[in-house]
UniProtKB/Swiss-Prot annotation:
Organism ancestry: Eukaryota, Viridiplantae, Streptophyta, Embryophyta, Tracheophyta
UniProt signal peptide: 1-23
GO molecular function: zinc ion transmembrane transporter activity
Role description: Zinc transporter that may mediate zinc uptake from the rhizosphere. Seems specific to zinc ions and may not transport other divalent cations.
Membrane disposition: Multi-pass membrane protein
Protein name in the entry: Zinc transporter 3
Organism expressing this protein natively: Oryza sativa subsp. japonica
Superkingdom, natural source: Eukaryota
């Protein structure tokens, strides 16, 4: 009787375990439950237009806004916009992309050795490697820009006056090299450009150029993955909530990237190219997903590995850029530190950006 009672107690747990195991097995199959290719195609076309418009609007807000006095790169409102954008980018890396990378690389659908041992956290390793690599690229690129600027900035030599024989020529040479103005004497030496006040602004411009280019690289990588995943789906129930969520996602990321582009002071042509690349990447990814949807199996081992590795690398890049190149730089700015009101506004914008982007993870 006791054994029978014990069996009855254990039976529900066995049924739950069997149900969970079956669900896991089904997740790895390329099922077509809820598939509606025609309905999904309509939603994909809407997604292409919506995400394209949202991304373009986001990146153009800071670019167009720099012509307005309130949104100048050195203005208080722009500080708040940058803090908001940095929060968005940080949440994108930590809340959206990195968890997805861990899910992909620890999926039960992947064949791995080692029995029941815990799988190695490859997502964390790839993310860390990408962050360190970003730091190396950041440093090397900044060094390259500095060296190129130094080669362009040649010191201006003073007029060399050679001393010739004769007291008159010596006195004349001394007169050229030294002038007396109102009781003080100064002599003219070489004009060294690196000691000029413009050096700081040149260094800042170099840093912003590097930051914006590396940041765009990280954003482009995961935008392609997002687009392909959406384009390859054949379930309208999966696509429908993603349309709005990814539109907001692209808009907020565009604001962050646009702010960096504005600070870098790129030429008009470079600014337009970077804005177009960002705006088109996710829609192009959707088109690629549509093209391969008939043969692409999102539940295959290859798909999990590729998606996991690229998401991990993208997360590492975005987390590094948001913390080191955006937040640390701006929040250590003396202008921010001596202005309590601006500090509070920047912190509020940071938490608002990170919070809103994190909320989107409910739907995306």
């Amino acid at each position: 009787m006791g054994a029978k009672k014990h069996t009855l107690q254990v039976l529900p747990w066995l049924l739950l375990f069997a149900q969970h195991t079956a669900a896991s097995a089904c997740d790895c199959a390329n099922t077509t439950d809820g598939a509606d290719r025609q309905g999904a195609m309509k939603l994909k076309l809407i997604a292409i237009a919506s995400i394209l418009a949202a991304g373009a609007a986001g990146v153009l807000v800071p670019v167009i806004g720099r012509s307005m006095a309130a949104l100048r790169p050195d203005g208080d409102i722009f500080f708040a916009v940058k803090a908001f954008a940095a929060g968005v980018i940080l949440a994108t890396g930590m809340v959206h992309i990195l968890p997805a990378a861990f899910d992909a690389l620890t999926s039960p659908c992947l064949k791995r050795g080692g029995g029941d041992r815990n799988p190695f956290p490859f997502a964390g390793l790839v993310s860390m490697s990408a962050a360190v690599s970003t730091m190396v690229v950041d440093s090397l690129a900044a060094g390259y820009y500095h060296r190129s600027q130094f080669r362009k900035a040649r010191p201006v030599d003073n007029i060399n006056v050679h001393k010739h024989a004769g007291d008159e020529r010596a006195e004349h040479a001394q007169h050229i090299n030294a002038h007396t103005h109102g009781g003080h004497t100064h002599s003219h030496g070489d004009i060294v450009v690196c000691g000029s006040p413009e050096e700081g602004s040149v260094a800042e411009s170099i840093r912003h150029k590097v930051v914006s280019q590396v940041l765009e690289l990280g954003i482009l990588v995961h935008s392609v993955i997002i687009g392909v995943s959406l384009g390859a789906s054949v379930r309208p129930s999966t696509i429908r909530p993603l349309v709005g969520a990814l539109s907001f996602h692209q808009f907020f990321e565009g604001v962050g990237l646009g702010g960096c582009i504005v600070q870098a002071n790129f030429k008009v042509r470079a600014t337009v190219i970077m804005a177009i690349f960002f705006s088109l990447t996710a829609p192009v990814g959707i088109v690629l997903g549509i093209a391969i949807s008939s043969s692409y199996n999102v539940h295959s081992s290859t798909a999990f590995v590729v998606e996991g590795v690229f998401n991990s690398a993208s997360a590492g890049i975005l987390i590094y850029m948001s913390l080191v190149d955006l937040l640390a730089t701006d929040f250590n700015n003396p202008k921010l530190q001596i202005n309590t009101k601006l500090q509070l506004m920047a912190y509020l914008a940071l938490f608002l950006g990170a919070g809103l982007m994190s909320m989107l993870a409910i739907w995306a």
